[in-house]
């Protein structure tokens, strides 16, 4: 007789559509989305990897403190850097242009800090991981830089570019997790969830059974 598997509700501590879509790829649907609004300013001399894991931890803790029910909270933060220099999350076309110039013809690194908290009976169990992917862009012409910086896709993206968009045409080399570049390393996410007791099951509301027959609505953002 098969054991009925009941997973805890999964809360995504991010309003990122990309992270929702990435979870969809591995057939996981967050029960709820609660964006964690925190100060993401790097500390003095803070390096990219420690920054990413610190921000992921702060996001997870903030959301965990806001909920009362037993849940699994997934939080992540992605940081792009050239050497030790952290590139901003571009908010203007000029920032996009600055970032693209910085990575043109150079290897750069994308770090995603992952923090997953299992909150059960007011006890917190943590899983944390920092994942690094190395990317190299070809040497871009002024025309390519100007064209890309005129697009919307780099706005609000770490490092001023969207790897799954037009910027993919610039990539000559990738070493590491592709999903990490997009904001959530899926291999590490599933491993962490599994270690906290999550299981795939046809009885589980957090998992798609059959996309062709189950039309499940996307979670709402709180």
From Swiss-Prot:
It comes from the Bacteria. One of its GO terms (cellular component) is cytoplasm. It is found in: Cytoplasm. GO terms for molecular function: nucleoside triphosphate diphosphatase activity. CDD domains: Maf. HAMAP family: Maf. Belongs to the Maf family. This is Nucleoside triphosphate pyrophosphatase. It comes from Rickettsia prowazekii (strain Madrid E).
